[in-house]
């Protein structure tokens, strides 16, 4: 999960004297939403492709006020980067070191491929969303309820949280689902959503939807 294992460096960082027209060609060639800009070896920020299209004759240095300032450190983890993809509506994130020097990038496709290997996304089985008052929330208890009913607990995400309650979506095996439901309700949980079919098309759809929910959270 360490970022350095997923860094690519074939996408160049551009200087402030590069024209927006040239930068746009780079973005299009790689099918990325942003290009990255440096000045004297120091990372400055990222510019959206749409901004380049609207300012083709300008140099990137003139577009500094329109830059998004996002990046991730070389020593970070994949999960540190997930939120950035959603927040900045990007499919590429620059990786820098502590001196703000460009080290390469991570692309959303690479992250999605890696996350899809996690049991939460890769295992067949049931998806179950439960709600519990925030003061009573315990991931340990949630896993114990599943396993005490001879179910397998493949993973869980906190998909919603506020001052009143926490909602947790979990991937569990298909065994003893009725007794798992009943136990959750007996312990004060509200069953928000159940998805127990394992038809391939619906399963892939559910994985995508919950990955998007995770990013939004």
Residue ranges and their predicted role:
Residues 70-71, 96-98, 102-217:
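Cytosolic regulatory modules rich in charged/polar residues
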Residues 13, 18-29, 34, 203-211, ...:
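Intrinsically disordered, low-complexity terminal regulatory regions
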Residues 31, 89, 166:
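Exposed loop/turn and edge beta-strand positions of beta-sandwich/beta-sheet ligand-binding modules
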Residues 33, 91, 152:
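Short acidic/polar active-site loop segments enriched in Thr and Asp
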Residues 1-26, 36-39, 43-48, 53-86, ...:
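Bateman/CBS regulatory modules and CBS-like beta-alpha motifs in cytosolic regions of diverse proteins
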Residues 17, 31, 57-61, 110-112, ...:
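Generic preference for hydrophobic/aromatic residues in regular secondary structure cores
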């Amino acid at each position: 999960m360490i970022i350095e294992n997923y860094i690519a460096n074939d996408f160049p960082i551009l200087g402030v004297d590069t024209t927006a027209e040239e930068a746009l060609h780079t973005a299009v060639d790689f099918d990325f939403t942003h290009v990255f800009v440096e000045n004297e070896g120091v990372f400055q920020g990222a510019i959206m492709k749409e901004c380049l299209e609207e300012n083709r004759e300008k140099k990137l240095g003139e577009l500094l006020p329109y830059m998004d300032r996002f990046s991730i450190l070389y020593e970070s983890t994949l999960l540190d980067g997930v939120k950035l993809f959603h927040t900045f509506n990007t499919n590429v994130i620059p990786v820098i070191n502590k001196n703000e020097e460009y080290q390469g990038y991570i692309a959303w496709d690479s992250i999605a491929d890696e996350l899809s290997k996690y049991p939460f996304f890769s295992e067949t089985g049931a998806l179950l969303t439960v709600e519990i008052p925030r003061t009573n929330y315990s991931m340990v208890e949630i896993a114990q309820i599943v396993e005490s009913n001879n179910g397998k607990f493949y993973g869980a995400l906190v998909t919603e949280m506020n001052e009143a309650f926490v909602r947790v979506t979990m991937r569990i095996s298909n065994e003893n689902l009725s007794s798992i439901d009943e136990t959750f309700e007996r312990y004060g949980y509200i069953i928000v959503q159940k998805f127990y079919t394992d038809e391939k098309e619906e399963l892939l759809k559910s994985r995508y939807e919950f990955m998007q929910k995770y990013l939004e959270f």
